Amino acid sequence: MRQSSQVRQTTETKIKLSLQLDESTNVSIQTGIGFFDHMLTLFARHGRFGLQVEAEGDVFVDAHHTVEDVGIVLGNCLKEALQNKERINRYGSAYVPMDESLGFVAIDISGRSYCVFQGELTNPKLGDFDTELTEEFFRAVAHAANITLHARVLYGSNTHHKIEALFKAFGRALREAVEKNANITGVNSTKGML
């Protein structure tokens, strides 16, 4: 089974995270940030991943450190769980509608970290979650996992719906990218490595 568990502890946060790429029954998220818990749960369910997150952070300051560090640890776990990247599709993309909003995510498990984020999030806060942290989360995951990730809100009016569409699309795109493909020999690259 492709899986990884890691702990990251700093003076600002303590993150314990486990990711299972090939199992989807065990999802438990506790970050202390309700909206973020909801988004991570949606990511795991729509990606069909097992994901357990326990996070303690300096949320009395704000949620920035917790959200970013969860992204870092998720990226690290993804990188470790993928092992040698043999026989995976490598690429994945998904459009996801959420009522009036439409989100799009494209992923390349390339060994090169890059993140492009486009989306106008007009409501600055949802509960205890600063909506600008959506971009910080995706950047942290892409950098730590060494993947290329494009996330875009094509249109919409409700900020909650826009972010929800992105997290669901992230799960679906990542599922496609990490899926094993019997038609691929070795890694999906003319270089012979990723």
From Swiss-Prot:
It catalyses: D-erythro-1-(imidazol-4-yl)glycerol 3-phosphate = 3-(imidazol-4-yl)-2-oxopropyl phosphate + H2O. Its main location: cytoplasm. Pfam families: IGPD (PF00475). One of its GO terms (cellular component) is cytoplasm. One of its GO terms (molecular function) is imidazoleglycerol-phosphate dehydratase activity. Pathway: Amino-acid biosynthesis; L-histidine biosynthesis; L-histidine from 5-phospho-alpha-D-ribose 1-diphosphate: step 6/9. Keywords: Amino-acid biosynthesis, Cytoplasm, Histidine biosynthesis, Lyase. It is an enzyme of class 4 (lyase). The keyword Ribonucleoprotein does not apply. Its EC number is 4.2.1.19. PANTHER family: IMIDAZOLEGLYCEROL-PHOSPHATE DEHYDRATASE, IMIDAZOLEGLYCEROL-PHOSPHATE DEHYDRATASE HIS7. This is Imidazoleglycerol-phosphate dehydratase. It comes from Bacillus cereus (strain G9842). The gene is hisB.
